[in-house]
Each structure stands twice: as structure tokens, then as C-alpha cells.
Amino acid sequence: MSVIAGHHVPRSNDQRQYDTPSVPINIAPDSEGHIHEMSRLKDYEVIEKLGQGTFGVVQKAKSKKDGSLVAIKQLINHSAKEGFPITAMREITILKQLNHKNILTIQDMIFEEPKMSNRTDIITMRGSFYTVTPYMSSDLVGLLENPKIKLELGQIKCIMQQLLKGIQYVHNQKFLHRDIKAANILIGQDGVLKIADFGLARIYHGNVPRLGMGPGGGEKAYTGLVVTRWYRPPEILLGERKYTTAVDLWGIGCVFAELFTGKPILVGKSDSHQAQIVFELVGSPLTWTDAAKLPNKNEYSCGLACKRSLEAKFASIMPTEAIDLLSGLLTLDPFKRLNALDALNHKFFSTDPLPLLPTQMPKFEESHEIDKERFKKLKDKEQAVSELKPPTEIRYDNHSESRYNADHSTFGGGVGGKETSFSSGKSDYIDHYEPRARRDHYEPRIRNDNKDSNDVRGEFESATRQEQRRRDIQNRLDAGGMDTYIPKTTTAKLREHSGTESLSKKYDNYQPINVSRGSKSPSPSKLSSISQSKADLISKPSAPKVASRESSLERKQVSNGIRTTTDVEPPRARARRPTDMFGRPLTSNSTQAQPTRNKSVERPKDLEKPTNGVTEDRNKKPVLEEKKEVVKPNLAIPKIKKSSSLVSLSSRSSTTPVISNPSKVTKRAASSVTPPVLPKKPKISKTSSESEVSDLEEDSDFTGENATVFERFMALEQLQKSPVYKRIINEKMRFEKLSGGHKSM
């Protein structure tokens, strides 16, 4: 395939006067006017991936011949029937006829032969085609997502002026772009804007736009599966098929507002929802006379009660002239919508500040749509630091507090259960404010002190803060003088670098307090005797007194040891742990052994330790097993239910079904008898226009306009002399031959 340089469709004299200045195509044909043999991928060094769309994958590369940076786009073949993608053929055919500085041009074509193990693989493994275009350092999505870039009004005017000039040239050549969005608008380091991705572009029939005369076209029906939903105009949402050049101006209006907001303004989840938010912004469809005649009545009816909010929404971020231009671009009636010539003559471009020249534009950091996630993380990080940064200096002590940073608790993180990633410790945060003295500055007191009635902080603290301080003091007293708490942030860092095992080994050598020399932590066998309740020891007449003294001594050691147990959980969690009748926190063993006042708890067999005078029969305990209970059939309860409790063999059998949770079962039974009547949610009808942007269903064969495109693409006599043309014809013949032979088999 070859591209003939300088080939244009004949135009009338009245069309030339609306053309903007153009630049020559950067293609060097041979003496016969043909481009030489197509390049190979090995002629380029791929650097990185720039993005991926519906019709191809774009990569940044460097030419090995001259060292220039280029963008290589792989043409994806969606249909196995096509030897060459029809969308790529249409894009190349249209770009061959466009020659403007604000339109992206094709420099080269690449063809890669398929790697086949046998001759039949050509049916599934065809050669790959690539287009080579000049490398553009940024696209509009990347610039708007980059937190380091803030567009000024003069820069916005320069971008909009170039965009309108480019789309005006496209419309004067009688083409519809049909996919205007921020991702398809590219900006180079020289400040020149280029419109890209003509995969959905089509020729239109009718008059070209004139100044003050509305849009052009509207004489032929097209598919409605065009334009990305967030930039889709209301006429396509309502089912119009004979649309005009106004569909591109609606997308430009959305991009114009996005330059001020930094994000898309009309983000719909479906076509019905998209139509609703459009009507909420620009007003009810009742103001548009022909809207009621369009086929999509569901989208029409959802906006009847909507009121216009465009001016109120953008009044605080856009000047008056910009709002007036935006209102003209986002007009419901496409025949009243501004065309490109009308927009270029708007007073927005003639008021101060004037639009910058492309050479005056700054050299922005390289920003593409693929960098969107990276920019989002960077933006969230900066926002978190700015929100948590205190207004005055920070005392670099993990336990210092002040009324100016009272939103952060003593232990790091937010107060009242609010999780934050900020800690006022020196290792986590460095403040750059210069310290300055204040008259009301005070020395931070230690956490064991009681609240002083003369403390000025009491005037600025809430009840939640005071309650937190009392809880901290109580936790400090319960710790027995030894601070074994590790801040959460430090613990997290230790776990990241060395894991939880090294953290636990760090405290293995800690010894209990108030224990005689040579004594160690109680063994598991001694813990079993400690777990016996006081009532059980008294009930054994043959038990010697020495055993009771030993058990009381061991109980005392354990109670002292509990206070020095290495516990890295926050003091708030320790405060919520259950305690015994003496206020001591319970461990897993002590919790199991703690008797209740009104109910006796039987001792497990494996924890009992036989003593002198106590027989084996007395220590025996009935074997416990799970019991299946038969439950009467009910609407809410199954016939057979497995009991979750353990039932002794000596217990009495009961015919009454045991219900583990009567409240839940009662609710279930009540709900089964009288089910609540839930309001029905309105169903959103999904029409054919809900599909993604595609034009393949109606153009899957070479009939109708596609045949005209192909004939126009291949009919030139000079084109047939090209070796690229011969390569495509040969591959097509091989495919038809092998495909026909494969079917006959």
C-alpha cells in the first residue's frame, strides 16, 4: 500500500476561501510519485507504550535511520473475514486527502509478515499493518490529569483556537470526525495542536458550514454507534441518524469545559443517564422543537422536568465570555449550535488575555492518557499531605499534643476512630515551617498527669478528646510502669522490613515483675491447676493446704506476668479487653477459667490435675458429642438442623426443638409469612445505542459506500505500480485461494 503525496479531492473556489493555512506533508516520494517499500518493525526501536484504543495500540519508538521520535499504531483486525481493517483503510484514505498543520499526518506504513509453521496458518495468522505518525509529547487527558500543570486562560484560548481551526478544515473537506474527545487531541513540544484518530470519520453529503448559517450535512443517514458516550451530542442520544457537522462541535464544547474543570463534565453510565445529565445541564428538551419527533422516547421523557444549570455551574470558574461561548457550543438544537467559523469569530478570542501563539506555549512535561493512574496517585498523595499539614510548628515528639494539632491522637492517626496515614513523629513527617514563639505556648505535660482545671486546653477540647485522655491514663496505669507499646507506624515498618517473626522475638526475653529470683513463667501444667476455681478447691476435702498455697502463689505470678506480656496492640484495644472482678485483664486461659456468678462451668477433662485423695471417677466427665435435633417443618426453619451447642449424654432428652437464636428465627418466620413489599426499581431499557463506539456492524462487507471507498483507494493508475499495492493484492489472492481450498476440504 502506498500513499500518494499531495493528492487532494478537487474543490470549488468557494471552499478554498474557508481553508486555513496548511503545511507540506513530510513525505518524500520517488520520481514517479510513489513512496518506497514499506518499512519493517526492525527499522524502529520501540521505547514504551503510549495508549490503547478500540482500533489499535500506540507505542513510542525511535527511527534507526534518522533518530526521530515517532508513534507506531498497530491496526487491529476485529473481523476474521477482512484481510485489511476497513476502519484503517477509511482512516488512511481520509488522511491522504487532508493537509493541515492541526491534523495528524501519516509518515510511513509498516507491514510484518506472519510467522507460519504451515501454509494453512495464514487463515488465522495474517500479517500486521502499522501506521507511523510524528510523536506528540502530550495529549489533552494527560495534561489535565497532571497535577503539576495548571493551564492559564491565554493557553486555553490558544488550544481552543487551534482545535476549532483544525475541525473547520475537516468540515470544509466534507468529512465528519465523529470521535472528538480529549484523548484524541495531541499537543507537541512546539505548542502545535493536532487532531488524531480518524477511524470513525466519514464523508458527509450536503452543504459545508457557513458563517452564521448553522451546520453542514444532514442529507444521509449514518449509524448511531459513534462518539464516546461522555462526548455524545443529544441528537444522537435521542436517535437522530441524519446528523450534521454539529456532532463534532458538541464534543468540542465538552472539551472546552474540561479545560477549566480538569475532568469530564458529563459522565453518564448509560445512554438514558447520559441524556438525563445533559438535560440537567442545558435544559429541558421542550426547548428543542424537533426533539419530540426523534425515536428514543425514553431518553426524551427523562429530561422533561429538568432545568438549565449551565451558567450557575460554571460562573465561579469561567469568565463571562467563556460561558457565552460554551453555551453556544452546548446548544440542544443542532441547527442553532455554533459551527466552527462562528466559534472562531466569538468575542472570547478577542478579549484580554489574547490567545498565545503556539511558539509562546510552555514546554509541558510529557503527559499521556496512559499516565492517568500515576498522576492520580500523585494527586491523592499531595492532597493527603496538604489536608493533614498543621498550620503551626510541630513539636517533634510522638507523645506531644497541642490544641493546634488536636485532630491527631497521641498514638498517631485520627481521633475518634478516623484512620489517617499521618503521624507527627519525626520519622514520618518533617514540617518546614519556621518555629515561632506564642504567648499562650505551654509545656506539654506527661500522660500520667491528671487534668488541671487551669489548663487552657480545656476550652478547646471536645468531650471525645477528654474521654480519650482518661482512657490513655488508665491504660498507662494498667501497664504497671513498663511501656511496652510500639506505635502503629513503627510496627508497620518493622513488619515491612523484617516480618512479624523478628518483632515477636524481640520481646521473648522479657521477665515478669515482682517474681522471686530463679522463678520462671508458669508451665502449662501449673496453669491447669490455676484454672480451677476457688469453689472447686474448697469442695475437695482431701486436698492438702500446700497445694492451695502453691496455686495461690502461681496465680499471683501469673497475674503479675500478665501485666508484662508483650502486647503490641494499641491501648484502646487493651482497654476493651474483658477484666476479672479485680480489674485485671483476662488471658485466654483465665477467661476460660473465670466462673460466672449464677452459672457453674464444668472443667474440661484435659485441664484437670488429679490430686491426693481425689479418685479418678470423680475427675471423669461425660463424653460430649454433637447432637442432631429434629425440628418441625416450618416456613423459616429447615426440617433437620444441626445444633451448634454440645449436649451431655446425661442430659434429659427434650421433644421441644432447640433454637439457637430465637430472635433471628422469629424474624425469618415473620418475614416468610408476611413478606415486605419492596418498591420496584425503574428498569433502564438498554437500546442498541448503548454499545461502544463501533462502525463495524454496518460496514463488514465491501458493498455500498465501502466499495466506493475501496475503489477510490485503489483506482489510481500510479497507485497500481507501487510494490506495496502488489503486496496487498498478492496477500488477498493467497488468502482467498487458501480460504477457498480450506472450505472445500
From Swiss-Prot:
PROSITE patterns for this protein: PROTEIN_KINASE_ATP, PROTEIN_KINASE_DOM, PROTEIN_KINASE_ST
Keywords: ATP-binding, Kinase, Nucleotide-binding, Nucleus, Serine/threonine-protein kinase, Transferase
Acidic residues composition-biased segments: 692-701
GO molecular function, one term: protein kinase activity
Assigned EC number: 2.7.11.22, 2.7.11.23
Annotated localization: Nucleus
Gene Ontology annotations of biological process type: cellular response to pH; filamentous growth; filamentous growth of a population of unicellular organisms; filamentous growth of a population of unicellular organisms in response to pH; flocculation; negative regulation of filamentous growth of a population of unicellular organisms in response to pH; negative regulation of flocculation; positive regulation of filamentous growth of a population of unicellular organisms
Ranges of compositional bias, category Low complexity: 516-534, 632-660
Biased composition (Basic and acidic residues): 380-406, 428-475, 493-508, 547-557, 599-631
Residue sites binding ATP per the record: L50, G51, Q52, G53, T54, F55, G56, V57, V58, K73
Ranges for region Disordered: 1-21, 380-701
Pfam families: Pkinase (PF00069)
Biased composition range(s): Polar residues: 558-567, 586-598, 661-674
Principal subcellular localization: nucleus
Occurrences of domain Protein kinase (ranges): 44-349
Cellular component annotations (GO), alphabetically ordered: nucleus
Active-site residues, record numbering mapped to chain: D179
Endpoints of the signal sequence: none
Catalytic activity of the protein: L-seryl-[protein] + ATP = O-phospho-L-seryl-[protein] + ADP + H(+); L-threonyl-[protein] + ATP = O-phospho-L-threonyl-[protein] + ADP + H(+); [DNA-directed RNA polymerase] + ATP = phospho-[DNA-directed RNA polymerase] + ADP + H(+)
UniProt family annotation: Belongs to the protein kinase superfamily. CMGC Ser/Thr protein kinase family. CDC2/CDKX subfamily.
Function, as annotated: Serine/threonine-protein kinase involved in transcription regulation. Phosphorylates the UBC2/RAD6 ubiquitin-conjugating enzyme (E2), leading to monoubiquitination of histone H2B and the silencing of telomeric-associated genes. Also required for histone H3 methylation. Necessary for the recovery from pheromone-induced growth arrest in the cell cycle G1 phase. Required for pseudohyphal growth and virulence in mice.
The protein's name: Serine/threonine-protein kinase BUR1
Organism the protein comes from: Candida albicans (strain SC5314 / ATCC MYA-2876)
